[in-house]
Amino acid sequence: MTERRLTRIHSIKERLGDSLSHHPNELLALFSRFIKQGKGMLERHQLLTEYESVIPEADREKLKDGVFEDTLRASQEAIVIPPWVALAIRPRPGVWEYVRVNVNELAVEECSEYLKFKEDLVDRSSQSNFVLEMDFEPFNANVPRPSLSKSIGNGVQFLNRHLSSKLFHDKESLYPLLNFLREHNYKGTTLMLNDRLQSLSALQTALRKADRYLLSISKDTPYSEFNHSFQVLGLEKGWGDTASRVSENIHLLLDLLEAPDPSTLEKFLGTIPMVFNVVILSPHGYFAQANVLGYPDTGGQVVYILDQVRALETEMLLKIKQQGLDITPRILIVTRLLPDAVGTTCGQRLERVLGTEHTHILRVPFRTDKGILRKWISRFEVWPYLETYAEDVAHELAGEMQATPDLIIGNYSDGNLVASLLAHRLGITQCTIAHALEKTKYPNSDIYLKKFDDQYHFSCQFTADLIAMNQSDFIITSTFQEIAGSKDTVGQYESHTAFTLPGLYRVVHGIDVFDPKFNIVSPGADMSIYYPYFEQEKRLTALHAEIEELLYSSVENEEHKFVLKDRNKPIIFSMARLDRVKNMTGLVELYGKNDRLKELVNLVVVAGDHGKESKDLEEQAELKKMYKLIEEYKLQGHIRWISAQMNRVRNGELYRYIADTKGAFVQPAFYEAFGLTVVESMTCGLPTFATCHGGPAEIIVHGVSGFHIDPYHGDKASEQLVSFFEKCKEDPAHWEKISQGGLQRIYEKYTWKLYSERLMTLAGVYGFWKYVSNLDRRETRRYLEMFYALKYRNLAKSVPLAIDN
């Protein structure tokens, strides 16, 4: 029998060195090509293009036997500073290695100071000066974390497995659970257990007595009828509204005390009423329920939050009722009050959210020592106002809620920073939702900070993001890609693992995507508004005349420009803000370039506002570009350009009307964190093509529930559209197949009911673990206080204050 041996796994440096030894001519030619381009940065796609260009196919076949091609494909970027080429290699999501090659000597070495080397691209002085380095890794050394990429985004399951084995290794270690249940209360009223129960044995005895008592009464008996008997045993309200539900929960706890396991623990914690008052932060933009969508900085995030709170309130009311409590929950969406409200309700302090009973929008103004800021300002200019804003919000919450919130949820960079300040001040559980991290949307905006900072103030924003993501108790994302990208692309959070802001600081370890604080909780679309086109009894036919006017009238005005000459064609439809990243002009260009596509279908885009001059510089530039493209490709007769539509109900029917034409929805963004419009269109049964960069790549199963397109390759995307519509022309069942595939995908994964159930469970589980373990990360918080006071504050002061006209 052959003896089995353990062999050492060679490092990437060693394997790359072997490749250079075995194929010196081919690799010298390639690296020399990199060097010839001079000092600079090469992106992954450029590296692969050069590889295929320089090395003949026959030689590439030889290289496939080794590791070089795999290493090159795993390289996300190369820094070229002759004679060195440094590679940032990502073998799998969340795992990075850095090497550099001396092309003159064909020698490879590890590049432990990769960021310092990278800074040479823009700032040679960093080599001699002391540079602040931020490193959060030592503070998280004792936080358990998985090692497999597939575990990323399943933080709560991993945490429960790890900590329950630690916490429940013997009877004595269960005391933190007993103490947690005894101390749990609402506004001073004890819930779950009272002080009669001082030991675990007393708790088990009381639970068994309660169980025997419940067997003697009807399952439907209301809790109020045996409330007094349970109080004598040491059990308070919160176990359930009926004998049946109380019995289920008592059995869960008995099972947990007898044989602890993670799933029982999570299930039990999910039944404990812990969240009654929720605060949701979203300061920037025009936050209102009507007439705001399409305004600058006002889009999917507003829709997300309004749908979120309706589902959340429904879930909270249901849980409170099921637990037998008479408590009124409260949800407050905190946003900015805009005295210059331009025809919206953004100047109103308090506004109830339609479709809810206990949820309101609370608006608090931005102010300085000179008074209240009246006008809208860009999300990139809010930084100098946020500290004072957080203080004002704390004061308003105390008066409005009359209780300390149980959970605070931040949205986007500004909301997450304010949530961090409030959570730190009030000592409450904090949840972070990024929606979009700008560092990913604007490639190389870190290393080339000086190019961006005057306009976008990314030095403030990236610092705020770093503070919020490290302080938060848990982070929810809509997709895996938001956290850790894919095999070939870097995730939004992952891009904050290590980066540099030349002249400010280096982040050598910013966030770990394996951290158990990350959880994927995908939202859905409001199914009272977005539902399939074939549900004829629900269709809003009264709106069809308006929609036909919008799409087909021969009149051009401030709401719609350009006239479609053939209304019998299917429609390619798209709806988004008019900014560079959303890439609506890219869609118009790929359509304009493809004559066959123009023959097959019309194009309808909803973006921007013809009726007013935008204050947003990016929107102004995209507006001009759109007109130029329409003229260049002679799209009059083929395109309808509609101003941003504020009416969500009509938008839902608009999706369905497009489906009636057997059209398709296209989402062409260069990057999309999630893709709410993708979910909306699929929920309406409209076949959907969406960017492969970001969340839509997970929402859509390519070829089954829709199609992925690459906005960086418009010609290929247009051919995909041609192929689809030609196939549908030959076989109408193909359109139905993709439509049904999209609906099936939505029902399985993307509904608000699933979302709200999961969010409530997460809030309870993280609140519990924060109580019984060291998950409050006190050391990290002290480090963040210093970072905020010494770095963020000065950066925020450097942002010019807005001036009211």
UniProtKB/Swiss-Prot annotation:
EC number(s) given by UniProt: 2.4.1.13
Name this protein carries in UniProt: Sucrose synthase 1
Class in the EC hierarchy, top level: transferase
Region described as GT-B glycosyltransferase: spans on this chain: 274-751
Molecular function terms, GO-annotated: sucrose synthase activity
Species name: Tulipa gesneriana
Source organism phylogeny: Eukaryota, Viridiplantae, Streptophyta, Embryophyta, Tracheophyta
Keywords of this entry: Glycosyltransferase, Transferase
Source organism superkingdom: Eukaryota
Intrachain disulfide bonds: none
Family: Belongs to the glycosyltransferase 1 family. Plant sucrose synthase subfamily.
GO biological process assignments: sucrose metabolic process
UniProt-listed Pfam families: Glycos_transf_1, GT-B_Sucrose_synth, SUS_EPBD, SUS_N
Gene3D superfamilies named in the record: 1.20.120.1230, 3.10.450.330, Glycogen Phosphorylase B (3.40.50.2000)
Functional summary from the UniProt entry: Sucrose-cleaving enzyme that provides UDP-glucose and fructose for various metabolic pathways.
Catalytic activity: an NDP-alpha-D-glucose + D-fructose = a ribonucleoside 5'-diphosphate + sucrose + H(+)
